[in-house]
Amino acid sequence: MQQTYQYGWIIPFIPLPIPILIGVGLLLFPTATKNLRRMWSFQSVLLLTIVMIFSINLSIQQINSNSIYQYVWSWIINNDFSLEFGYLIDPLTSIMSILITTVGIMVLIYSDNYMAHDQAYLRFFAYMGFFSTSMLGLVTSSNLIQIYIFWELVGMCSYLLIGFWFTRPLAANACQKAFVTNRIGDFGLLLGILGFYWITGSFEFRDLFEIFNNLIYDNEVNSLFVTLCAGLVFAGAVAKSAQFPLHVWLPDAMEGPTPISALIHAATMVAAGIFLVARLIPLFIVIPYIMNFISLIGIITVLLGATLALAQKDIKRGLAFSTMSQLGYMMLALGMGSYRSALFHLITHAYSKALLFLGSGSVIHSMETIVGYSPYKSQNMVLMGGLTKHIPITKNTFLLGTLSLCGIPPLACFWSKDEILNDSWLYSTIFAIIAWATAGLTAFYIFRIYLLTFEGHLSVHFQNYIGKEKVFFYSISLWGRGASKKINNNFSLSTMNNIESSSFLKKKTYPIAENVRNVTRPFITITHFENKKFYSYPYEPDNTMLFPLLILGLFTLFVGSIGIPFNQEGVDLBILSKWLTPSINLLHQKLSNSMDWYEFWKDTVSSVSIAYLGIFIASLLYKPPYSSLQNFDLINSILKRGPKRILWDKIINGVYNWSYNRAYIDSFYTRSFTGGIRGLAKLTHFFDRRIVDGITNGVGVINFFIGEAIKYIGGGRISSYLFFYLTYVSIFLLVFFII
């Protein structure tokens, strides 16, 4: 067993040869490398599969022996300081390694077909390989220095992948926004790391935890300074995991290719912040203020992410805000001290969300056959609907991920979310009520996405998108499907410049050639499709895109079973508890692992009821128009025109504007921080040009005129010398006698 652990250092470096070889090949043998480009995807999958097998082997050994292995190389600089590098193999490392590799393999297989017609195919797989290396290096790090190095590499890779289509202005702005926002958190992380080193004198986790706990126990450290350092470290996790208030980069990150969105949202970048807090939980756990602060940020993010997802029309942005809310659940669990439930939800959510994002990519891929390459149209749920009969496999797998995220048993997310909700009642009643209500909102908005995408008729034809009849306006409100209607030109539903809505109001025709579909985008030109037919309706993608959906669907069905505590009658099947032994769980330190089935069913009824309520309301409002007229009659009979109806409409519009405008947080940041920095830059520019340059230029001009005067005086004429001499003497005497 120990021989297996000794080779743990190789885990991050196995995927690394692919980006190196691609770079060298493009530099030295560009033609041959491009001709063999499909070979690189196979090698990427093969190497990541090797890492997955190795990680599974380590996990099995840990489950059986509850062992932790750490290896350190010391580089002694002097007697007072030594720089150490190594790797740490513990339950958290093995969980994250399996998560990264399994989701990564599915994304790579999916991307082989999804990116097949992209000219930057090789660059994509080079970035993906480096991304996997960076994340695997992060989770195997044994000290804070290595954590920070790989933390920055993960941020750099996310910057490259979000801005993959960098010649598109939106993608370029999105990657810059993600980079700058994460730099704020990373600066706090660096300061926090240096602060903890100043306190303990060590970067190694084991020494750091032991020394710090002893200092806290003996009351030999300033509590305010310790809290500040812990808060700065937590700021790094807040930015990376898109927690309030540094969440603003996440929806814009959808400008990258859809497989990148799946990888970032499931197992890599956003999971890094959760991993950091979980790794440093022995530090945070002895600082009550920080634990309370973590849970507070978590519950705010839970509610904010859910409300912002309510009115999104872009399918990927809706899923992005869903990720933000679910990460808030994980952060809430860590703040409550429920270490096990946080990691459990990290696992279940990763597979469910990867399934949903890859499913959305399949939907987008199929919609492009009708509307052409345009993210405003192919990702717009207003133009979708009725896709069930066109892409049934995608529909069924997407429904599986939808129900899992809603919290419907026995799917994966039900078990983990239910555990977090149960623990929240033991921690804070207010937090528990918010978390429970948000579970209903989650079911509402995620099922809304499903209904708008797959149920009813294909709206791109229904609203005469390529037809002849003029449509005045097509709205998709918060509480129902779109309907054509005339509107007042002075009416403004939201304060944002709604580019998305205007993009599909114009009556245009988007023909598709019979043999060739030319789709041109900046830097990327797609000139050939294998399907040489005219498509007026979407179609199911190739098998290489469907296979990952089916595998992730199986994970969504069965991965929740690893955390179910079936351990009665001497049979212990709670794999996750064995895996995490000894785990940290403040709420259940004195409880046995056996399940109280009465409590389980009581809590299950509560959580499942709110989920079904959200699904029912979404079905009531977003069912196909032809089958929901009676529902609208029922709603109209309940909410008749009058003062109450007017008040209700104002509330609905307020909620819609709040959601669609992202709670006005982006606008606030733009006006306050961005505007303030630009104002300061203008002031600095004015001071530099007018004051600093003015003084410098003024001295030069004065010297010029003085030189000209001296040159005129020194012309060699004695009469001029006498004249100026007598003039200066007269002025001097006059001033002298007056004073």
From Swiss-Prot:
Q: Which GO terms describe its molecular function?
A: NADH dehydrogenase (ubiquinone) activity; quinone binding
E.C. number(s) listed in UniProt: 7.1.1.-
Membrane topology per record: Multi-pass membrane protein
Question: InterPro entries per the record?
Answer: NADH_UbQ_OxRdtase_chlpt_su5_C, NADHpl_OxRdtase_5_subgr, ND/Mrp_TM, NU5C-like, Proton_antipo_N
Q: Where in the cell is it found?
A: Plastid, Chloroplast thylakoid membrane
- Report the enzyme's class at the first EC level: translocase
Cellular component (GO) terms are: chloroplast thylakoid membrane
Q: By its UniProt entry, which Pfam families does this protein fall under?
A: Proton_antipo_C, Proton_antipo_M, Proton_antipo_N
Q: Does the keyword RNA-binding apply?
A: no
Q: Where do the TM regions start and end?
A: 9-29, 40-60, 89-109, 125-145, 147-167, 184-204, 224-244, 258-278, 289-311, 318-338, 354-374, 396-416, 427-447, 546-566, 605-625, 718-738
Give UniProt keywords alphabetically: Chloroplast, Membrane, NAD, NADP, Plastid, Plastoquinone, Quinone, Thylakoid, Translocase, Transmembrane, Transmembrane helix, Transport
Q: What does this protein do?
A: NDH shuttles electrons from NAD(P)H:plastoquinone, via FMN and iron-sulfur (Fe-S) centers, to quinones in the photosynthetic chain and possibly in a chloroplast respiratory chain. The immediate electron acceptor for the enzyme in this species is believed to be plastoquinone. Couples the redox reaction to proton translocation, and thus conserves the redox energy in a proton gradient.
Quaternary context? NDH is composed of at least 16 different subunits, 5 of which are encoded in the nucleus.
Similarity remark: Belongs to the complex I subunit 5 family.
Q: What name has this protein been given in UniProt? A: NAD(P)H-quinone oxidoreductase subunit 5, chloroplastic
